Regions:
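SDR active-site strand-loop-helix element
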Residues: 8, 32, 69-72, 112-117, ...
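NAD(P)-dependent short-chain dehydrogenase/reductase
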Residues: 153-201
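NAD(P)H-binding glycine-rich loop region in Rossmannoid oxidoreductase-like domains
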Residues: 55-91, 126
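N-terminal Rossmann NAD(P)H-binding glycine-rich loop of SDR-like oxidoreductase domains
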Residues: 5-24
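Conserved glycine-rich Rossmann-like NAD(P)H-binding loop of the short-chain dehydrogenase/reductase
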Residues: 27-35
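Rossmann-fold cofactor-recognition segment
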Residues: 44-54
Length: 201
């Protein structure tokens, strides 16, 4: 059955891959992102170049009444989160609450697929990490992801908004069929840098 899917941050590395996967599944896919990258938008049913918490974006969510919201938008680097935590708490937590506060009043609640991070584990002693390990984020970035995970649990208990959390660890690589979606140039992620070094060595 065809679903209506909104991907926030759908022009980004992870969001663009997810948007394409839903489209290949036969779903209607709409992207909301502050940055327009043409090559990531060629197959989607619609896109809106705007902050995901703007009035325009929230009106779009309301009008589309999606079955699924894949929430990838936010600020994502650990280092800058230490020097400018306000930006991270605003973009990753406060704005997500605005989105959830809209959705909680929907008669038909969409499932929220949240793009979290393995950084919620901090410097845990059990490696590799598994989902049952305690979380102990050490950066503001990781803390914002852990906070949203907790908020999603509370919103499920209070408002029956279903959600699933994905804790990624250093996603890297290109889309395997067309090779038109892939890692950003000058990536800061260690896996991407290691791959680049091995290819150019």
């Amino acid at each position: 059955m065809e679903k209506t899917v909104i991907v926030t941050g759908g022009c980004g590395y992870i969001g663009s891959h997810i948007a394409r996967a839903f489209k290949q599944n036969g779903d209607r896919v709409f992207v909301i992102d502050r940055v327009k990258r043409e090559h990531t938008l060629k197959d989607v049913d619609g896109y809106f170049i705007s902050d995901f918490a703007s009035e325009e974006s929230l009106a779009t969510v309301l009008n589309l009444s999606p079955d699924v919201i894949v929430h990838c938008a936010g600020t994502s680097l650990v280092g800058p989160s230490i020097t400018d935590p306000a930006d991270y708490y605003t973009n990753n937590v406060s704005k997500t609450i605005k989105l959830l506060d809209l959705v909680k009043d929907f008669e038909k609640k969409p499932i929220i697929l949240f793009s979290s991070s393995a950084s919620v584990y901090g410097n845990g002693t059990n490696k590799p990490f598994n989902e049952g390990d305690p979380i102990n984020p050490i950066s503001p970035y990781g803390k914002t992801k852990a906070m949203v995970e907790s908020i999603l649990t509370d919103y499920w208990n209070a408002y029956a908004i279903p959600s699933t959390v994905f804790r990624y660890f250093n996603a890297a690589g290109a889309e395997p069929f067309n090779f038109d979606l892939g890692q950003e140039p000058n990536a800061t992620h260690i896996v991407a840098r290691a791959l680049e070094a091995s290819i150019t060595a």
